[in-house]
Design a protein with these regions (language model features):
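Helix-biased detector of long, well-ordered alpha-helical tracts
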Residues: 86-345
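Positively charged, small/polar-rich N-terminal and surface patches that mediate targeting and assembly
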Residues: 1-88
Length: 345
């Protein structure tokens, strides 16, 4: 049986304990060094075949041990997965039915400006942040101590597998709340799904990925809306909370400020290359690991330094979002290319 799964635990001791218990049950498992592109706290992971995934789940239930991550081998790439989705992910290729990938499907800024120009604004004294500065989310004051953050983000898949796509899409949507200085409270699923092409099981795994990311963020699932469409689209409508006087905006940067990025650049380049079959396996795995990493911890650190301006870098890239920040702040941005953090490939 081909071993096509890597199961990550928090320590070498746990890996060895699970390996012994699994072998006692006749499972073909082995403790192996973690590949460079797979994040492991201890450097050792458990290798097993997807055919034994259910049996390994039973072993883990008995031991009361949960893996910190699971990766499935697809070609030469290790892609985020779960023991439950190990077989489903092999049956579909999400990007085959999509003309665009991820935020690359966004309409251009110029087109949006043309369409919105002349339309009336529905203003209110309690609307703290609206559409004027193209910020990451809207903010509405409820009381002197509490404001609600409203944002939505959905996109076509930029990876082939359902579970990691769900995780990535949810992380993108939640990031807008942290970019405004807030805390995610609740989210709703937004889905357009080609049922005949992909079948119901792939949808379940997309939603599973989104749900696990929501749980990691501390937000709850409050419902959703699904339609049957020609292409797969998935994302979230997210509600968050923030103090009205502590809202972060994409405007407010001052001359002399340093530009700090919470993640390395290059994920869009890697996923676009992967769609064309031109990306190396380790590069795809590294990119997916970063795309599923939440900006929550970075936001906690930013609170301590009281930033002048904050924005979420996604579909328009660093240059596009830096230009938005410069325009909203009334100043210029100077980028030193050699200083920009890029994926370690």
């Amino acid at each position: 049986i081909q071993r096509n799964l890597l199961v990550v635990f928090g320590s070498v001791q746990r890996v060895m304990r699970v390996e012994r218990a699994a072998r006692d049950r006749g499972l073909d498992v082995d403790a192996v060094p973690a590949p460079r592109s797979v994040s492991s706290e201890c450097g050792v992971v458990l290798e097993i075949g997807s055919a034994d995934a259910d049996a390994l789940t039973d072993v883990l239930d008995i031991l009361k041990i949960e893996p910190t991550a699971v990766y499935r081998k697809k070609g030469e790439t290790w892609t985020p997965s779960t023991l439950e989705t190990a077989t489903v992910d092999q049956l579909v290729k999400l990007t085959e039915g999509s003309a665009y990938g991820g935020c690359g499907a966004k309409l251009s800024k110029g087109l949006l400006h043309t369409v919105l120009c002349g339309l009336p604004r529905l203003a209110s004294d309690d609307l703290i942040v609206g559409i004027e500065s193209a910020d990451d989310a809207g903010v509405v004051r409820l009381t002197d101590e509490l404001a609600l953050i409203h944002t939505t983000d959905f996109s076509p898949p930029l990876v082939d597998d359902p579970y990691p796509f769900g995780r990535i899409a949810a992380a993108n949507a939640l990031s807008d709340v942290w970019a405004m200085g807030g805390t995610p409270l609740a989210a709703k699923n937004l889905v357009s799904y080609p049922l005949k092409q992909l079948g119901k099981e792939a949808l379940k795994e997309v939603l599973r990925g989104g749900l696990e990311t929501m749980a990691e963020s501390g937000a709850v699932l409050a419902g959703g809306h699904t339609v049957e469409g020609q292409e797969l689209l998935y994302g979230l409508a997210v509600t968050g909370t923030v103090h009205p006087d502590k809202v972060w905006r994409n405007g407010g940067a001052l001359p002399g400020d340093a530009l700090v990025l919470t993640k390395p650049l290059g994920t869009g380049l890697v996923t676009t290359a992967a769609k064309g079959g031109m990306a190396e396996a380790d590069h795809v795995t590294t990119a997916m690991r970063w795309m599923t990493t939440l900006n929550r911890d970075a936001a906690v650190i930013l609170v301590e330094v009281d930033p002048h301006a904050v924005t979420d870098v996604t579909g328009f890239g660093l240059a596009g979002h830096a230009a938005e920040m410069a325009e909203a702040s009334g100043c210029a941005v100077e980028l030193e290319l050699e200083a920009l953090p890029a994926l370690s490939l």
